[in-house]
Amino acid sequence: MVLMILPFIGSVSVSESLVAMITMCLAYLILKFFRTEIPEGLRELPGPKPLPIIGNVLEVGRNPYLSLTAMTAPRTDVFQIQIGMRPVVVLSGNETVRQALIKQGQEFAGRPDLYSFKFINDGKSLAFSTDGPAVWRARRKLAYSALRSFATKEGTTPEYSVRLFEHVSKERYAAISMFMKLMADFDPVRHIVVSVANVICGMCFGRRYDHNNRSWLNLVNPRRDVRKVVASGNPADFIPILQYLPSTTMKKFLNINARFNEFVQKIVSEHYTTFNKDNIRDITDSLIDHCEDEPMDPMPDADDKIVGIVNDLFGAGFDTISTALSWSVMYLVAYPEIQERLYQEMETVMGPDRMPCLSDRTQLTLPEAFILEIFRHSSFLPFTIPHCTTKDTSLNGYFIPKAPCIYIKQWPVIHDDDDVLDPSSFNPDRFLKADGTEVNKLNGEKMMVFGMGKRRCIGEVIARNEVYLFLAILLVQLQFHAMPGEPLDMTPEYGLTMKHKRCHLRAAMRRGTEE
């Protein structure tokens, strides 16, 4: 973590460094002096003793999902660390997390006022902003209504039951075509990223781009870097003085956000110009329509908020879905016997002459279990987006004051030996009932990839359907293999979403692809 701070400092004089150190020391002493009193009957949060200024950054290290899990064992599912100058409450354990996010959902529904969050969607992000409850609820209601309307919207031709299936089915031609051109040696992540971005772009804006369109690639690929900056541990969020020092990482982060905001703003403006209430083309039209039908009184600047919501839907959906699919392909290659079982089940259910569709999902239990096991085993979302408390509260008998940053660890919840048999092994059957004909919903609900409670992802249903459709279509048409003599490296690289290391794979055709 200390090494993460160094690139943010840049070239700073000795006098500036001394002033910064003195300022931080004074701030640290003031914070210690004004510590909140613990109410009678409640306990102080346990946790490792922090060092002045830097807090517990040395103990947290570069892989917080592992180090914070190690801290849990000798203590409790609720404890406190300090990152830089800022106290951070860490929650883990299935029961504790459910207590906080569901039973005490309102008290843990806030977002911390982190420096980096202010620059996401110009501070208008539904997911990251610190808007008050009235504004946040109005914006969430607007986004949910638009998504629900579009999720059930019929396709443009009888061939497609819903619009999502239409976008995924059309995009698979381009993706599989690219895989086939490079069959002997290709990077799956590159084409998965563009395919997923195109599906979301089609849903949000009614358009798609070629896989080799340089402008589109330059816009989409850097979006994967945004999540690294807002991962648990961005130094400027926790050591305020770093906000005023040169930082190439933050400069890049701001540039990526500004370029994408400009892209979304332009398309939303075009949609306002061409909007027709009798012809809702995409999610942006649906948002405009719902804004006109139900004006959001608590929500100022509705046009800007639509840009923020669309930006959020694109960013969150794009990153989560593309990461899930890229991990899926890696696991197919790592476990070829499971890849073959998946293919055989789909052939049995669907027959050899048609593509998977959404209505098959309830019958295809092994693919559903496979996706859940990928969520669990890869744990590519080790933390939720940071929360904060909206008022003084308590959890498990410990006092938690208003507004500290709350980290909710998903990694140990789904790697707990008490809840999961042999958690280190990859075994999709753990999510099936004994006869293998039905998914065990109780086990599946423990996978908090889309969060829970008041901050649960509103696009969860669409995201799950998209992951299923993409995976199923790829499976029935392609067989994936590792490159000869090149072992797969499944070690995750830490970030808000954890990616595997880029690699090259091979593919073989199972079925022909009609044009």
UniProtKB/Swiss-Prot annotation:
Tissue specificity, please? Expressed in induced liver, kidney, gill and gut. Weakly expressed in control liver.
Lineage top rank: taxon = Eukaryota
User: How does it sit in the bilayer?
Assistant: Peripheral membrane protein
Location comes to:
Endoplasmic reticulum membrane; Microsome membrane
Q: What EC number(s) are associated with this protein in UniProt?
A: 1.14.14.1
Induction and repression of expression: By 3-methylcholanthrene (3MC).
Q: Name one GO biological process term.
A: progesterone metabolic process
Q: Which PROSITE patterns match?
A: CYTOCHROME_P450
Q: Name one GO molecular function term.
A: steroid 17-alpha-monooxygenase activity
- Return the GO cellular component terms, semicolon-separated: endoplasmic reticulum membrane
Instruction: State its cofactor.
Output: heme
What does the UniProt keyword field contain?
Endoplasmic reticulum, Heme, Iron, Membrane, Metal-binding, Microsome, Monooxygenase, Oxidoreductase
Name the family the entry cites. Belongs to the cytochrome P450 family.
Q: What does this protein do?
A: Cytochromes P450 are a group of heme-thiolate monooxygenases. They oxidize a variety of structurally unrelated compounds, including steroids, fatty acids, and xenobiotics.
Kindly provide the name given to this protein in its UniProt entry.
Cytochrome P450 1A1
